[in-house]
From Swiss-Prot:
Disruption phenotype annotation: Cells lacking this gene grow similarly to the wild-type on D-Arg or D-Lys as sole nitrogen source, but are unable to grow on D-Arg as sole carbon source.
PANTHER family assigned: KETIMINE REDUCTASE MU-CRYSTALLIN (PTHR13812:SF19)
Induction comment from the UniProt entry of this chain: Induced by growth on D-arginine and D-lysine. Repressed by DauR. ArgR could be a transcriptional activator of the dauBAR operon in response to the presence of L-Arg.
Protein name, as recorded: NAD(P)H-dependent anabolic L-arginine dehydrogenase DauB
Keyword set, alphabetical order: NAD, NADP, Oxidoreductase
Biological process (GO), any one: arginine catabolic process
Gene3D superfamilies: NAD(P)-binding Rossmann-like Domain, ornithine cyclodeaminase, domain 1
Length: 315
């Protein structure tokens, strides 16, 4: 069989199509498929460039119901003017073995990361949660606010970021008028029920053990080696959840460090999203902080690329 030419979708078109996709529902469905054995999530592949010049991570996934599999490859290229990070997703047919789609996945990555956090917030946050803290003000923070704004009756949304200026604040307020700048990190965290860490930091941003009251803290990944937004030693003092228990502990920086240096075990993870959405894991009781860690799954990339492909094919 001759090789098929895949659809090639550049960033501008990907953004246009993304606006027409229910990303939150796509993420919920993939974790339900994972729980039902209709999806497969291999571990991430980290490949380091020689001489410390960067790395690339491959995110793999299989959606049996949709008869597709795929890989997103994302390099972290060290440069004098700062690191360069890109991402492209290749979607393949399980029926023909031919490529279906090659897509610039930069914005898709941001969307699926935020939507996955939102799925976790909906599953883990107390029903009465009303105070939201957003740590970060870049595109990832904007996307997080977009997907969580309707999940609870937020009475206040406090934002803290060293880069938060009036332009960024107004941009966040365009998403949710309740967003307001906090004068300090401490002010943003004060009495918060849900804390969304949306930074590109490779080192701890907050210590959940110092919160005045138990809260749900969510954390994402960046490509930096062993990146983490909370101290590794804090895991033992929290109810820990993750996107997928079979892969996250092998990639999340604080989990790796906690296991190596602080006696923490991945067996302490109370549940992942597949287990939570299929009622196979307990919810937190909030006698202490709850922590949700996502590393970004290939399944998320494949599900979103597949939704984009189907939409593109439908015209």
């Amino acid at each position: 069989m001759s090789a098929a030419t895949p659809l090639i979708v550049q960033q501008a078109e990907a953004e246009q199509l993304l606006a027409r996709i229910d990303v939150l529902q796509a993420m919920r469905q993939l974790f339900l498929d994972l729980a039902a054995g209709q999806a497969l999530q291999p571990a991430q592949q980290l490949v380091e460039f020689p001489a410390g010049r960067g790395d690339f991570i491959n995110y793999l996934g299989v959606l049996a119901q949709e008869q597709v599999y795929g890989v997103k490859t994302s390099p972290y290229i060290v440069r004098e003017q700062g690191p360069l990070v890109t991402a492209w997703t290749l979607l393949m047919s399980m029926q023909t073995g031919q490529p279906l789609l090659l897509c610039d996945a930069a914005r898709l990555t941001t969307a699926r990361t935020a939507a996955t956090t939102a799925v976790a917030v909906d599953a883990l946050a107390p029903a009465e949660a009303c105070r939201l803290a957003l740590i970060g003000s870049g595109p990832v923070a904007h996307a997080h606010l977009q997907y969580v704004k309707g999940l609870r009756d937020w009475q206040g949304v406090r934002v803290h970021s060293p880069c938060l200026d009036e332009r960024r604040l107004q941009s966040l307020r365009a998403i949710d008028p309740r967003a307001e700048a906090a004068g300090s990190l401490e002010e943003a965290l004060d009495e918060a029920d849900v804390i969304l860490l949306c930074t590109s930091s490779a080192r701890a941003v907050i210590d959940p053990r110092q919160l005045k009251r138990p809260a749900l803290v969510t954390s994402i990944s960046t490509n930096a080696p062993r990146a983490h937004e909370v101290p590794a030693e804090s895991l033992a003092a929290m109810d820990v959840y993750c996107d997928y228990r079979h892969t996250t502990p092998g990639s999340a920086g604080e989990m790796l460090i906690a296991a190596e240096q602080h006696g923490w075990s991945p067996e302490a993870i109370r549940g992942d999203l597949a287990e939570l959405l299929s009622a196979q894991a307990p919810r937190p009781e909030y006698r202490r902080p709850a922590f949700f860690r996502s590393i970004g799954l290939g399944l998320e990339d494949v599900a979103l690329a597949n939704a984009l492909y189907r939409l593109r094919q439908a015209g």
